[in-house]
A protein has these predicted regions:
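Glycine-rich segments within core transmembrane alpha-helices of 12-TM secondary carriers
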Residues: 149-162, 410-418
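Helix-capping/helix-break motifs at membrane-protein junctions
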Residues: 140-141, 197, 396
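Intrinsic disorder in cytosolic terminal tails and internal cytosolic loops
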Residues: 1-20, 202-206, 451-457
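Cytoplasmic helix-loop-helix junction between adjacent transmembrane helices
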Residues: 119-154
Length: 457
């Protein structure tokens, strides 16, 4: 009989009532809506941003990649902080940074200032997401899958429907208003914090008096940042000496991180977490799926505009059917985890993403672009509902917050790799060719699912 993905562990501490996964999922899903809109909405506005700021279209990929990069980097940091502090503090700090960075991005006079704002906002988004998923992931039994499915559906719908929102806002208010959309998370925060006790019942805490491994955090940050930068080095015209220096910094960071893990097993990247059975496959498979999805999200609106001759509003409206697929996908994948083995579910999600990327790359016309985007949306929504929530099942209770942060880092980093790779390849080959090459990434995730499946204890 195939092994189903088990449900999450029970919440720590005593409680006089059973937490409702649907109610909690709705509250948290509403909170993450603005930041997920911030993923899809700017993709439609990128052509307008490039024209307004007088930069090449490929350079605007940084607007998506910067957000995904710092979002991914903030997740393990937030995970370690939640092992020492209340998730409420992490959540509030994340939402404040999200709003402040988005306000800066929306008012930035040049692309570098806009990117700085997106970097700050992305870090806030990452902290918010890890706090949200930590709370939902600690629910017991089917309530966990239910809450994660609702959050995944909300995130996928918002990020893909963000193209419609972005198109409408770009057409009526301008691209700056699009980048400022995440500021709307601030008024939603009080509603999510109505039941503060929920955010304190996320299981055991460890090392509450320990110090954060800043060296390990810095090494991981430099490694991830150098990877994203190198992928886009050609598209932004970085000189060869600068590119080599970034590559050297990335290599040194990789060596330093490896040395730090051996010297400090309980550091920022604990060896016992990385070595946990199924942890690396889950993170890598999820990252490849996210890379494929965000690569499609970066290019699809531009391709539709080229084919139809319309503007941002038309492109966003045409992508709405693809967004609608996220709702049934998130719920269906959650139900399938009871019937199929984890490797079957993850392989199916990767396969959907591969096919979606290739359909968008190979076929012309708005219908194939929408159909391919819909397939990629299904993979994205399913990965959030299943793979992102696996951390509590892969490690000991005391490592859950740390593992959640690192696993989310690996998965969400793919969101930065996807558009960066497409933008970098588009400078040496046609855009569709670059997107077709990107399909190799989720294809590798499919192969990994079949050979080293992400399983739980």
């Amino acid at each position: 009989m195939p092994q189903a993905i088990p449900a999450g562990g029970a919440l720590g501490g005593s409680t006089n009532r059973a937490l409702d996964g649907r109610r909690l999922g709705l509250a948290l899903g509403m909170l993450v809506l603005p930041q997920y809109v911030a993923l899809g909405a700017p993709s439609v506005a990128l052509p307008a941003i490039g024209r307004a700021l007088a930069v090449p279209f490929g350079a605007t990929a940084w607007i998506l990649a910067a957000w995904s990069l710092t979002s991914a980097l903030a997740m393990p940091v937030a995970g370690r902080l939640m092992a020492r502090r209340s998730p409420v503090r992490v959540l509030v700090a994340g939402v404040v940074a999200l709003a402040a960075g988005s306000a800066l991005a929306g008012t930035g006079p040049t692309l570098p200032v806009v990117i700085v704002g997106r970097l700050i906002g992305g870090a806030g988004a990452g902290a918010t997401v890890i706090a949200v998923f930590a709370v939902a992931g600690a629910l017991p039994g089917r309530e966990r899958i239910r809450a994660l499915g609702i959050i995944a559906a909300a995130g996928a719908t918002a990020s893909a429907c963000g193209t419609l929102v972005g198109g409408a806002v770009t057409a009526w208010l301008g691209w700056r208003a699009v980048l400022a959309i995440p500021v709307l998370a601030l008024p939603l925060l009080p509603a999510a914090l109505t039941d503060r006790r929920t955010f304190t019942e996320t299981g055991e805490r460890n090392d509450s008096s320990g110090r954060l491994d800043l060296v390990g955090a810095a090494a991981l940050s430099v490694l991830a940042g150098s990877l994203i930068t190198l992928l886009q080095a050609h598209s932004v015209g970085l000189p060869a000496p600068v590119t080599l220096a970034i590559a050297a910094a990335g290599a040194l960071a990789a060596v330093g991180l490896w040395w730090r893990m051996r010297r400090l097993p309980d550091g920022f990247v604990p060896r016992r977490v990385i070595a946990a059975r199924g942890f690396l496959p889950a993170g890598l498979v999820g990252g490849t799926i996210f890379a494929g999805y965000y690569g499609v999200l970066f290019l699809a609106p531009s391709l539709i505009e080229q084919v139809t001759g319309g503007g941002a509003l038309e492109a966003g409206a045409l992508l709405v059917p693809a967004a609608a697929c996220s709702v049934p996908a998130g719920r269906l994948v959650g139900a399938l985890t009871d019937r199929f083995a984890s490797w079957q579910v993850s392989a199916g999600l990767a396969a959907f993403t591969v096919v979606g990327v290739l359909v968008v790359a190979a076929f012309h016309g708005p219908i194939p672009v929408v159909a391919g985007t819909a397939l990629a949306v299904c993979g994205f929504a399913g990965a959030q509902a299943v793979l992102v929530g696996l951390a509590p099942e892969l490690v000991a209770a005391r490592d859950r917050d740390t593992a959640q942060g690192l696993l989310s880092f690996m998965i969400f980093l793919g969101g930065g790799i996807g558009p960066a790779a497409v933008a970098g390849l588009s400078t040496i080959a046609p855009e569709r060719v670059g997107l077709a090459v990107l399909a190799a990434i989720p294809l590798a995730g499919l192969a990994l699912s079949l050979t080293r499946p992400p399983i739980t204890h």
